[in-house]
């Protein structure tokens, strides 16, 4: 009997030990599982954080690209032509003369930025902007294709103090304008300029003096048959001819003084003289200092004063 009791007790002890061992094992497994789940959660959080960071970075890159695209504003060729006509914006052509003279928007302004490597042109444009473009109106820039020239001009205008929100590029530049019917012209006689005149009698009083310049824009043969003493001549008989306008422009730049008044003589005091004034405006002359002799060479007193030397 005693032996059975001892045996039974021993079996109970062994059983309890086994239970305890199983409990410890379960505890270890539970702890390991919890740790694994915690690690997985941490990994998920890290992945989420990484995704968020990547998304933020992508968003920043997208924003930067958008800002880069938005740094230049655009206007259509048709709107630029309309703006020049109704004076709702300054339409500024920045092409070099040889391209500009072959076709320009009527009533546009001209201040070249080409060749782009010529720093003196940027300086001149900065001065021009301060004197002519600082009135708060929008500015529409025309270059060859709506890219490099307009981009450089935009930078120059901003450096000159022009608000960037007022500066627009004509999309496609002169190439787009060529596709717009009637957008480009070589006719300058219909410009919206405040044409000024001088009476024939007053012009004759100034002949031979050093205070004014007399510019005869009649053709070579007509000029040779009779002209005012001391005058200089550049034919604009073919008023829409780019070559004639170029010759006039070069003479104005090289032989004439922009600080002195100019009296222009043409056949009748109309289109040829007006063309000359428009060209001289591009050459840097103040239109308030340019005068058309009334009635031109049709005036009998003017004819009587002609010389042939």
Language-model-detected regions and their locations in the chain:
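Rhodanese-like catalytic fold shared by cysteine-dependent sulfurtransferases
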Residues: 4-8, 20-36, 55-77, 81-86, ...
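Bacterial N-terminal signal peptides
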Residues: 9-17
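Coiled-coil-like amphipathic alpha-helices with heptad-repeat character
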Residues: 17-20, 92
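Long, intrinsically disordered low-complexity tandem-repeat regions enriched in serine/threonine/proline
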Residues: 39-55, 63
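Structural scaffold elements adjacent to functional motifs in cytosolic proteins
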Residues: 91-93, 214-216
């Amino acid at each position: 009997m005693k032996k059975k009791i001892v045996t039974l007790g021993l079996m109970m002890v062994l059983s309890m030990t086994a239970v305890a061992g199983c409990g410890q094992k379960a505890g270890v497994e539970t702890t390991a599982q919890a740790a694994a789940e915690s690690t997985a959660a941490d990994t998920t959080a890290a992945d989420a954080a990484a995704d968020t960071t990547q998304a933020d970075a992508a968003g920043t890159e997208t924003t930067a690209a958008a800002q880069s695209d938005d740094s230049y504003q655009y206007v259509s060729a048709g709107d630029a032509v309309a703006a020049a006509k109704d004076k709702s914006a300054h339409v500024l052509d920045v092409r070099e003369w040889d391209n500009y003279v072959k076709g320009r928007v009527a009533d546009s302004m001209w201040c070249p930025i080409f060749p782009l490597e010529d720093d003196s042109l940027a300086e001149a444009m900065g001065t021009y902007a301060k004197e002519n473009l600082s009135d708060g109106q929008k500015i529409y820039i025309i270059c060859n294709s709506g890219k490099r020239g307009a981009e450089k001009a935009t930078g120059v205008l901003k450096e000159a103090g022009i608000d960037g929100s007022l500066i627009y590029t004509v999309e496609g530049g002169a190439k787009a304008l060529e596709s717009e019917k009637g957008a480009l012209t070589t006719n300058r006689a219909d410009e919206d300029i405040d044409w000024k005149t001088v009476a024939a009698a007053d012009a004759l009083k100034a002949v031979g003096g050093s205070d004014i310049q007399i510019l005869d824009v009649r053709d070579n043969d007509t000029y040779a048959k009779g002209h005012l003493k001391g005058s200089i001549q550049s034919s604009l008989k073919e008023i829409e001819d780019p070559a004639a306008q170029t010759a006039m422009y070069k003479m104005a730049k090289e032989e004439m003084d922009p600080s002195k008044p100019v009296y222009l003589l043409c056949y009748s005091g109309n289109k040829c003289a007006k063309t000359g004034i428009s060209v001289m405006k591009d050459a840097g002359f103040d239109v308030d200092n340019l005068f058309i002799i009334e009635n031109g060479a049709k005036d009998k007193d003017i004819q009587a004063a002609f010389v042939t030397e």
